[in-house]
């Protein structure tokens, strides 16, 4: 049973909740929710920080990329061939982007680390460029510890780090605490919550109408200079220029965690903290919408983006999901949830 959130949980408890989590089995086929040439996967890489907190590794996309340039994201990318699994996609792309070895023997022998898969059945999410994004959640830790329990407590101290940037794809690597995403939802009466100091300096959210559907948009702003950052991450050269980051008060550079990356990470943090009841679990991901687009709307097809998709991506306010999805199915989507 997943622990309910009545107090701030330890990193071990957060991980145990993630391991226990089971997404309801999707009634859809793989080709409907993860259609070829529109399918991508990302890896959510968790590890123990300097204060024993659970942190997540994030990247900043290169400005040279055509889509989501300069955005904060997870390591990941698109599938190369039809039968490629989402795990293979995420691990292959993570090796290309940040140097995370796909081979567990290499990770063990050369870097002294192990990687546990925690959640492998997260639902698919829809990106603004009409890709189906499948996340996997993993935990990275040192493999030579005195006790098994230490992997949940001992900070990930890396003397030889695999991390390297692919200048064409990634401009920087950094991390944030997983609990930062939901600390505002935890009970203020709890002493640990009262004393908790989030690393973001600003959080905001608003509703955005995109295609006749309301979307919850969240932003978390983190200063680039962070005393809580892991030393081994600080040794990696930041290839991003100062004009790629936001500037707080005209002085301090910051990174903006928002969009789909923020949505997925928020959901993972909710699961870890036991904040995901059955209703919210049913609202995870965007599989119903992806099916509506692919199966009923003839969108997200392998032969390139449609004129409708291009218009939606470019923000044409005259376009709606109801232009391509049948009325009865749109009614079903809007009855499922009021906010996406």
UniProtKB/Swiss-Prot annotation:
Major location category of this protein: other
Keyword Phosphoprotein set for record: no
Extent of the transit peptide: 1-7
UniProt-listed Gene3D superfamilies: Nucleoside Triphosphate Pyrophosphohydrolase
GO cellular component, one term: cytosol
Protein residues bound to Mg(2+): 93, 97
Cofactor(s) demanded: Mn(2+); Mg(2+)
Modification after translation: The size of the cleaved transit peptide can be of 7 or 8 residues.
Enzyme class (EC, first level): hydrolase
Coiled coil: none
Motif (Nudix box): 77-99
One annotated GO biological process: coenzyme A catabolic process
Other information: Present with 238 molecules/cell in log phase SD medium.
Function: Diphosphatase (pyrophosphatase) with specificity for coenzyme A and CoA derivatives. Catalyzes the hydrolysis of the diphosphate linkage in CoA to give 3',5'-ADP and 4'-phosphopantetheine. Prefers oxidized CoA disulfide (CoASSCoA) over CoA as a substrate. May be required to remove potentially toxic oxidized CoA disulfide from peroxisomes to maintain the capacity for beta-oxidation of fatty acids.
Protein name from the UniProt record: Peroxisomal coenzyme A diphosphatase 1, peroxisomal
Species of origin: Saccharomyces cerevisiae (strain ATCC 204508 / S288c)
């Amino acid at each position: 049973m997943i622990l309910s959130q009545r107090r701030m949980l330890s990193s071990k408890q957060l991980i145990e909740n993630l391991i226990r989590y089971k997404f309801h089995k999707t009634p859809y086929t793989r080709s409907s929710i993860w259609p070829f040439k529109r399918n991508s996967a990302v890896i959510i890489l968790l590890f123990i920080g300097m204060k024993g907190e659970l942190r997540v590794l994030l990247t900043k996309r290169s400005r040279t990329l055509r889509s989501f340039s300069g955005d904060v994201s997870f390591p990941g990318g698109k599938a190369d061939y039809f039968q490629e699994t989402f795990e293979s996609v995420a691990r292959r792309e993570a090796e290309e982007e940040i140097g995370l070895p796909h081979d567990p023997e290499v990770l063990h022998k050369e870097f002294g680390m192990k990687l546990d898969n925690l959640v492998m059945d997260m639902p698919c999410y829809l990106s603004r460029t009409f890709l189906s994004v499948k996340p996997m959640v993993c935990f990275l830790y040192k493999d030579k510890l005195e006790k098994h329990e230490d992997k949940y407590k001992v900070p990930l101290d890396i003397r030889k780090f695999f991390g390297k940037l692919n200048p064409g794809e990634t401009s920087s690597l950094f991390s944030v605490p997983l609990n930062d995403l939901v600390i505002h939802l935890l009970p203020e009466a709890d002493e640990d919550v009262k004393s908790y100091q989030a690393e973001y300096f600003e959080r905001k959210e608003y509703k955005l109408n995109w295609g006749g559907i309301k979307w919850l948009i969240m932003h978390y702003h983190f200063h680039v200079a962070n005393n809580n950052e892991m030393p081994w991450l600080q040794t990696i050269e930041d290839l991003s220029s100062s004009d790629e980051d936001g500037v707080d008060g005209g002085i301090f550079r910051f990174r903006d965690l928002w969009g789909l990356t923020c949505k997925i990470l928020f959901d993972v943090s909710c699961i870890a903290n036991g904040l995901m009841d059955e209703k919210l679990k049913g609202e995870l991901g965007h599989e119903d919408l992806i099916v509506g687009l692919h199966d009923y709307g003839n969108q997200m097809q392998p032969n390139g983006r449609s004129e409708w998709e291009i218009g939606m991506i470019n923000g044409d306010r005259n376009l709606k999901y109801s232009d391509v999805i049948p009325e009865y199915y749109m009614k079903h989507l809007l009855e499922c949830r009021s906010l996406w």
